[in-house]
Amino acid sequence: DRDYFRIVSSAAVREHDKHHILKYLDPDVEFKDVTEDYACLGVFGPKSRSLMTDMAGKYFANEDFPFGTSKNIKILNITVWAQRLSYVGELGWELYIPIENAKIIYEKIIQDGKKYQI
């Protein structure tokens, strides 16, 4: 959707960033802070692509999901916003999950990750 985007920033500077955005926001643009609506879980490491493929039922190849991109995926029929990035120097994804589904997705990561010693 070209009329929609997300800004992800550190929890430590959430209020600072929010204030800065609102200060310069065009009056025709709606700002909605959804921080409390989502949990973020990270899946990182050399086996992360295999685990993500198992959980989402798709192959997460470089050409299909390049570094620095994001897309909505389904895990257990739950829409999860996945971002391919890494702050740890390994292949990986951040998963933004509706807070009410965070526990079930976490349990899925742990269960399916056993196969990969995660």
Where do the protein language model's features map onto the residues?
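Basic, glycine/lysine-rich polyanion-binding surfaces/domains
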Residues: 1-118
